[in-house]
Structure formats: C-alpha cells, structure tokens
C-alpha cells in the first residue's frame, strides 16, 4: 500500500509527554521523608533529620527510573528559575523603593550606590552612612546601578515595572515546574534527544538571547547612554518606547537609522557603523567598554549561535549526529576513542552535570578577570569596592562549581559507569594509567610547593639577616615573569595587525595609556614583576594540589589497590568496615571534602593577590598635571615578596578599617568579622574530634535526663564521621568566606 506524504509526515510526529503523570498531593508533601520508605516511618534517633537532608534531593536513592529522575531534575530547574526571578525582582524593587539611583545617575563618580536603609529600632541606624547626594544608607557593591545605567534605565519607576515583571516570571516558572511534572511530564526520549536539545539551546537560548539583548542595546540603551554621556539630565531623556517607535528621534543620534533596512538588504552593512562599532578600549566618559562595541559583539554572537543551532540532525535527515561525531573521534594512540561517551552523556545526568559545572566554574573565573581588565558597564571601573566584590564573588563561585564538577564526576563513576560499555575507549584508557597520572601530578605538586614556598622562606630569612641584596626582588636577584610580560606585549601589539581599524587596545591591562574618570583611575597598564612571579607559583601550587585531590577521587572512585571493591561501598563511606584498618577517608566524598579545603586556599590567595595588587599598582587618583597616586603607594612589589610582608603590609595593615569600625557606619563589618571568626573556629570542634568522644558525652547527658524522668522520645546519636566532617567543612568555609568578606568590604568601602 502506498503511503501518502501526509501519512509519512504524521509518522514523524512523536508524542513526547505523558499526561497526568503524578498526582498532586499536599497530604503526601506534608509528610516528612515521603520520598523514602525508611524515612517516612518517622524519627527513632536524631540521625533521621540528617538523613532527611542528605537524601531529599538525591533522586537516585528515591527511584531507579531514569525517566522519573529526569522529570524531577527538570521540574527542580523551573523551581530554581522561579527563585532567581524572585531574587531579581527583589533587587529591582530595592532599587525602586529604597535606593538613591536617581541621585547616583547625576554624579556616578562621587555619589556611592545604596539600595537599603536600616530602620531605627535599637540603634542600628548607625549603619546608614552618608553615601552622598543627601542620602544615608548602606553602601552596596553589587554593580546593579552600573548595569541599570548600561541598560538605559533612567528612573525608579522603570525599576518598579521590572520588579513586577520579575514577580510575574517567577510565578510562571513555579507553575511550569508543577505543570511539567504533574500534568504534562516529558518522556525519557525527550530528555535524551541531544540533537534537538543542542539546536534549541544554541539557536533559542543563546542565539535569540544575544539577538534580543543586542536589539535592546541598539534601540534603547545606546541612545539613552549617549544622551547621559553628553550630560543630559535623566528626567529630560525621552522614555524608552519613544526610541523604539520614533525613527526621527533615533536618526538625530545615529544618522544611519534614517536609511532603515535598505543597507542591510543591499549588503552595505558598513552604513550601520555609527552604532555597531569596533573601537576597542574604554569610553573616556564612563570608563566602561563602548556600548556600541558591546551591541556589535552580541549581534555577531547571535548570528554565530543561530547558525550553530541549525547544525544538528533532527527530523529532516541533514546535519550532524552527536553519536557519529563522537564515535568517529579516534586517533592512532587512543583505542576506541570516544566510543561509548554518547551513551554516558544521555543516561548519566551526573556525567552531564560534572562537565557543565567544570565549564561554568571556569567561565565564572574568566568573567572575574574580564570584569576589571575590560570593565563592561559605565562607571564600574572607578567603583573600587564593587570591582573587588565582583572579582571575589565570581572567583568563589568558580571554585565551588569546579569542585562540584569533580564531585559529580565521582558520583557518575560510582553509580552510572559500566566498564563493559567503555572497553578501551579514552575514559577506560585514562582509568588504566591513573597511577601514572596521579604520581606525576603528585611530583608536580611537590616541586611547585617546595620551590614556591622556598622563594618566600629565602626572602624572609635574608630580610631578617639584613641582606636585602641577596633577596629575590626587582632591585636585587630578579625573577621577572618574562613569559607573562611577553604575552602582555603580544596582546598590546596584535590588534594593530588583526584589527587595524580599532582605535585602542583590547584591554589597558596589557599596556597603553591611563584611563581616568573624574580624577579616579579606571584602568591602566598592570606591570608585572618578581612579586607577581612568586605569588603566581603559589597559585600554581594550590591549584595543582586541588586538582590532585579531586582527580584522585574521580579516578579511584570505583576501586584502588587498597580497596578493590570500592564501587560497592558507594560514593560516601567512612571506612571499609571493622577489621580493615587504614581504609578511612578514602571514599570519593572524602576526596571532595579535602579538595574543598584546598579550593578555599587557592581562591583566598587569588583574591588577596588581586586586592593588594590593584590597590598598589592600579587604583588611585591622577592629578591635572598627570601625577598618579595609588592607594597603597605601589608597595606590592616590595611587600609581597616575603611571608612577613603579606602578614604585615596586607592583612594587618588593611584590617585596620574592620578592626576600628565600631561606632561607625561600617560597624556591621566589625561584628561580622568577629562572628565569622567564631563560626570558623567552631568548625574545628567538628574537624578535630572523633565520634566516640561525642557519643560518650551524649550517654552521660541522657543518663542525667533519665534520672530526672525527662528522657527524650527520639534517641540522641552523635553525628556519623561523614556528617561531622560535612558540618565542620560547611562552617570552615562559611566562617572563612564571611571573615574575608567583612575584611574586604570594610577596607573597600573606606577607599572607594
């Protein structure tokens, strides 16, 4: 029988959702631990509450159905988006209702941003410092004001509307999370359709996202910012929609608008170069990247991503197949190459998450560096407190995401990896020579650690002996970072060849002139010397040790010479049972636990380096005669070459603001500094003591309760080894980060 074209088309249409998959039951949700038969019985011991928290989001432990796990993750993503939109709404509401945004717009260099006013209840109104522009409030360092300026927002009313829009989106996302789990739940094959997912994410999310952003920048942000830069008062600038509907108004600012779309369809795209520019450098009025460069950048990205979103094969039989690409990827020394990876990435969400976390973490760290080297928003470069906050924020996020990537890679190895399906592919070959990888990485860590700290110990010793001529320094035995200086020079000179029409360098960090806004330095060439060379090798050391610990946790997740059957013990286990001494702290979870301490070390050194370097060699003022005065007077090169210098000239010297903050608007930072130190010290109680100690203590406390006929119905238990470590780690990181935050903010607010 001949099949008509209509019939053939209908065969392509597949039903990818299941209707009314799971009943909506508030009664079920109200029962703690409803997702687990054991937990649903209720608590018998205090361990129950810990297991409840540990397993609530461990969907693997709740069901063996990959489809059900996929649906739960998908629904949870909508919940996450709902929270994000609610947060964005709250930020804009604060800007609309509690902020000095309008005043800041009139004088962004001298007026500080504030979007929170503390109520006078028991004297906390002391926190409302004078931020300028007849406004008292807490100085914020989030960068929202600069971003709003870049978007073309000129009044608090517009912030109100965005806040309302954010609330609406939050509600829609919440509804979508419920709808796509309970009413129309996608089937497993929908989640596993990698080609369709790539097309939609590339063309839809990234492509159309970039296109809509560049459209907003061209039609709304550019004209408004051009008028603001020219000194027009915000209240005199037309409303955003007028630039959209009034071409005459736009063509006064950008003459090519009068020509409409004719240049586009005739191929004379150069006509649009008045608003799609390739200038390079920074806008001298605002100290930020040229918004017309940013619009051009996003338009180009939109074109690339929309093209990329048509690359993969779906219903039409043309384009790439992800499986074919992966399986064709093999060389003479790589065995089966990438064979089997497609199956891993479509059946293990832990494998997907591991890659995505590693990528997003790396991207966050890249963003941290771009924020100061190429400041994207108007007046953000001269707001030193915000620059320091954003750098620190993105570095911490990057560190946590990369560590999380290793955690989920290890969970994948334990729960989802099937050796038989990966025989002689790249993953299998890496696992087979893991001893060589870890041994070499261990050697690198020892080399870097001994040499990097050796430089400092040498310098501290020579300084103590009064022999400055024998120290490693720019004035004695030089250790110049010649490769870094060479790369800086290449980046400074290359645009002259690769982008001959650009007006300035990509980033003034590489070289060039000093960019100042209102007498404050926005950016200038960052000179590198011996002190940078030395601390760079501390960075290399701490990062390599973090990688060593995390990679060992992944490569030995399933087995090791010590514990051959490790895969059977799971992702987290305290020891390999009684009678096997020396097997504690060998689970993949324990590797993540240890790796997080080293991640904390790594990021701390990076943010300390950044903070001191920028205050010493970049941030400061420039007088009309061109003389530059840096905040700490260029003391990094001399102070950062000894351990004592780091302690005295950075930590102790710059802690004066937080230590002496009492009775001032910065006093909250003094309290946080003390409180966070306490939280950090509290963590040591969990990290340095064993479970038996606490169980014995609990037994005696329970005995006392029994004597008074006051015994609890739920039996108290000491935390397990793993639980104790988790609590200790959480407080260690929270305390450490809180201490650093208070130290940085009290200092930064005083110098900006």
From Swiss-Prot:
Protein name (database record): Photosystem I P700 chlorophyll a apoprotein A1
Keyword annotations from UniProtKB, A to Z: 4Fe-4S, Chlorophyll, Chloroplast, Chromophore, Electron transport, Iron, Iron-sulfur, Magnesium, Membrane, Metal-binding, Oxidoreductase, Photosynthesis, Photosystem I, Plastid, Thylakoid, Transmembrane, Transmembrane helix, Transport
A Pfam family recorded for this sequence: PsaA_PsaB
GO molecular function terms noted in the UniProt entry: 4 iron, 4 sulfur cluster binding; chlorophyll binding; electron transfer activity; magnesium ion binding; oxidoreductase activity
One GO process term, biological-process aspect: photosynthesis
Binding-site list for phylloquinone: 694
Cofactor note: P700 is a chlorophyll a/chlorophyll a' dimer, A0 is one or more chlorophyll a, A1 is one or both phylloquinones and FX is a shared 4Fe-4S iron-sulfur center.
NCBIfam families in the record: psaA (TIGR01335)
Residues that bind [4Fe-4S] cluster: 575, 584
Enzyme nomenclature, EC number: 1.97.1.12
Organism of this sequence: Phaeodactylum tricornutum (strain CCAP 1055/1)
Lineage: Eukaryota, Sar, Stramenopiles, Ochrophyta, Bacillariophyta
Coiled-coil regions listed: none
Binding site for chlorophyll a': 677
Subcellular location: Plastid, Chloroplast thylakoid membrane
InterPro entries on file: PSI_PsaA, PSI_PsaA/B, PSI_PsaA/B_CS, PSI_PsaA/B_sf
Family: Belongs to the PsaA/PsaB family.
Chain's role: PsaA and PsaB bind P700, the primary electron donor of photosystem I (PSI), as well as the electron acceptors A0, A1 and FX. PSI is a plastocyanin/cytochrome c6-ferredoxin oxidoreductase, converting photonic excitation into a charge separation, which transfers an electron from the donor P700 chlorophyll pair to the spectroscopically characterized acceptors A0, A1, FX, FA and FB in turn. Oxidized P700 is reduced on the lumenal side of the thylakoid membrane by plastocyanin or cytochrome c6.
Bilayer topology: Multi-pass membrane protein
Top-level taxon in the UniProt lineage: Eukaryota
UniProt cross-references to PANTHER family, sorted A to Z: OUTER MEMBRANE PROTEIN, OMPA-RELATED, PHOTOSYSTEM I P700 CHLOROPHYLL A APOPROTEIN A1-RELATED
Gene: psaA
């Amino acid at each position: 029988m001949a099949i008509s074209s209509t019939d053939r088309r209908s065969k392509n249409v597949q039903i990818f959702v299941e209707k009314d998959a799971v009943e909506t039951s508030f009664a079920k949700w109200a029962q703690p631990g409803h997702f687990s038969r054991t937990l649903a019985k209720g608590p018998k011991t205090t361990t129950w509450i810990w297991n409840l928290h540990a397993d609530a989001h461990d969907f693997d432990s709740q069901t063996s159905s990959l489809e059900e796990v996929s649906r739960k993750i998908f629904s949870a993503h909508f919940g996450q988006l709902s929270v994000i939109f609610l947060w964005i709404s709250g930020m804009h509401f604060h800007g609309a209702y509690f902020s000095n945004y309008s005043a800041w717009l009139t004088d962004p260099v001298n007026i500080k941003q504030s979007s929170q006013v503390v109520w006078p209840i028991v004297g906390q109104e002391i926190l409302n410092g004078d931020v300028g522009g007849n406004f008292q409030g807490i100085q914020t360092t989030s960068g929202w004001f600069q971003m709003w300026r870049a978007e073309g927002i000129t009044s608090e009313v517009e912030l109100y509307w965005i806040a309302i829009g954010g609330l609406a989106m939050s509600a829609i996302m919440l509804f979508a999370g419920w709808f796509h789990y309970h009413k129309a739940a996608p089937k497993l094959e929908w989640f596993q359709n990698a080609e369709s997912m790539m097309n939609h994410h590339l063309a839809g999310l990234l492509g159309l996202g970039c296109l809509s952003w560049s459209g907003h920048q061209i039609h709304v942000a550019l004209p408004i910012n051009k008028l603001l830069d020219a000194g027009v008062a915000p209240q005199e600038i037309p409303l955003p929609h007028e630039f959209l509907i009034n071409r005459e108004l736009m063509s006064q600012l950008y003459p090519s608008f009068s020509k409409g779309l004719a240049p586009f369809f005739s191929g004379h795209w150069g006509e649009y170069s008045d608003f799609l520019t390739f200038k390079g450098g920074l806008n001298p009025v605002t100290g930020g990247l040229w918004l017309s460069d940013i619009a051009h950048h996003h338009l180009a990205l939109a074109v690339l991503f929309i093209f990329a979103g048509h690359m993969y094969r779906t219903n039409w039989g043309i384009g790439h197949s992800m499986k074919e690409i992966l399986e064709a990827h093999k060389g003479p020394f790589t065995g089966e190459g990438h064979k089997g990876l497609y199956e891993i990435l479509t059946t293990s969400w832990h494998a997907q998450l591991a890659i995505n976390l590693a990528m997003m973490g790396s991207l966050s760290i890249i963003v941290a560096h771009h924020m100061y080297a190429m400041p994207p928003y108007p007046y953000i470069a001269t707001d030193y407190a915000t620059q320091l906050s954003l750098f620190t924020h993105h570095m911490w996020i990057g560190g946590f995401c990369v560590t999380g990537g290793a955690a989920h890679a290890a969970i994948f190895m334990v729960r989802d990896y099937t050796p038989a399906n990966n025989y002689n592919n790249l993953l299998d070959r890496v696992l087979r020579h893991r001893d060589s990888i870890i041994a070499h990485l261990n050697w690198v860590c020892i080399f870097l650690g001994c040499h990097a700290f050796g430089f400092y110990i040498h310098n501290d010793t020579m300084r103590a002996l009064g022999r400055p001529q024998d120290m490693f320094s720019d004035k004695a035995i030089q250790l110049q970072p010649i490769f870094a200086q060479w790369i800086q020079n290449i980046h400074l000179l290359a645009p002259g060849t690769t982008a001959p029409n650009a007006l300035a360098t990509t980033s003034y960090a590489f070289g060039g002139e000093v960019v100042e806004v209102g007498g404050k330095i926005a950016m200038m060439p960052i000179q590198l010397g011996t002190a940078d060379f030395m601390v760079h090798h501390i960075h290399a050391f701490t990062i390599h040790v973090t990688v060593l610990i995390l990679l060992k946790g992944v490569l030995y997740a399933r087995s090791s010479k010590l514990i051959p059957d490790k895969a059977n013990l799971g992702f987290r286990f305290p020891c390999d049972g009684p009678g096997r001494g020396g097997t504690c702290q060998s689970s993949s979870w324990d590797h993540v636990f240890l790796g997080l301490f080293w991640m904390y070390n790594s990021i701390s050194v990076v943010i300390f380096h950044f903070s001191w370097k920028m205050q010493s060699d970049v941030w400061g003022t420039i007088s009309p005669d061109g003389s530059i005065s840096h905040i700490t007077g260029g003391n990094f090169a001399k102070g950062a070459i000894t351990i004592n210098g780091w302690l005295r000239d950075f930590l102790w010297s710059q802690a004066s603001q937080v230590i002496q903050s009492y009775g001032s608007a910065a006093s909250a930072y003094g309290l946080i500094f003390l409180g966070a130190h306490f939280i950090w010290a509290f963590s040591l109680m969990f990290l340095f003591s064993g479970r038996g100690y606490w169980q014995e203590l609990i037994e005696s406390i329970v005995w006392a309760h029994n004597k008074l006929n006051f015994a609890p119905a739920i039996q108290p238990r000491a935390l397990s080894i793993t639980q104790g470590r988790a609590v200790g780690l959480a407080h260690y990181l929270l305390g450490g980060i809180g201490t650093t935050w208070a130290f940085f903010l009290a200092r930064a607010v005083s110098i900006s």
